Amino acid sequence: MKNILWSGLLLFLLPLAACSPQTTKTSETAGTREAKTLSIGAIPDQDPQKLQRQYDKLATYLEKELGVPVKYKPVTDYSAAVTAFKVGDLELVWFGGLTGVQARLQVPGADAIAQRDVDEQFHSLFIANKKSGIKPFKDISGLKQLKGRTFTFGSDASTSGRLMPQYFLQQAGLKLEDFKGQAGFSGDHDKTIKLVEAGTYDVGAVNEKVWEKRTQTKEVDLNKVEVLWRTPAYYDYHWVIHPSVKKKYGDDLAKKVQSAFFKLDPKVPEHQEILDLLEAQKFIPTQNSNYSQIEAVGREIGKIK
């Protein structure tokens, strides 16, 4: 009887013994991959579906170039991108000028490592609904026409959709109180364009590259909305890398990431698609000191304490 019981017990335990190590190994492999995954993100300055598509493609490219798993993690708003970078949930982030400064001030050792060719000479656009009767102008003094009009920015933390437009408005002698009602905050550039196009606001401030892309794809009704003024140039978007990647991947990861961006070649179809999605001709080096003007304006306007 005892022999029968022991035989039955062995038959029960043998499959478990065979399966358990494999299950543990699989779990450890998945856990190791997750721990080694480079998490990338971006401020949500455009339609979330467009962002998901472009950064998924970029993640695939970076994974191949860097030899480590790379995953794009979307965030809900600009401040969430800064917070996620601060706590290390995101390690490589596409920030605007303002959010990049905010992030680096909260993470000592973080570095701006790359920007598009257009980002060292970036511009905002003031756009208007044509029924507003406001005519395009060539000088900053023309902004005085906006007094008593309805106006919307993009995100509250946007460089091209809020910070620099407000700075230029102040240079022209306008305060937010000079607009009709309260100045709006649409949340992103696409929404600003649609709100002005619909006549919800007379005027809005938008990112020049987003405007160009949407007009090229005929997503804007130019019979209803037009550009009033193009601002002077300033430094804007850039990639910022978290200092924790040195311990996780080695001291040379930042240089490898830079090389991957600089390697993007419009003559290579796969690369051209990524560059088109990111609205770039190429990527170039940058450094933290390039954003000193943005930091100064941010402190002046109260967006940086």
Question: What positions do the PLM features span?
Answer:
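Ligand-binding cleft/hinge of the Venus flytrap
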Residues: 56-67, 155, 160-185, 215-221, ...
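A conserved helix-loop-strand patch within extracytoplasmic ligand-binding domains
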Residues: 116-172
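Short, well-ordered beta-strand elements
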Residues: 30-49, 68-73, 148-152
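A ligand-binding cleft/hinge motif common to bilobed small-molecule-binding domains
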Residues: 94-107, 170-171, 197, 202-222
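C-terminal motif of bacterial Sec signal peptides marking the signal peptidase cleavage site
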Residues: 15-18
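An extracytoplasmic/periplasmic, membrane-proximal ligand-sensing/linker region
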Residues: 20-21, 33-57, 234, 240-241, ...
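Short helix-initiation/N-cap motifs at beta->coil->alpha
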Residues: 72-83, 96-98, 176-194
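Short beta-strand->loop
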Residues: 110-119, 179-182, 215-233
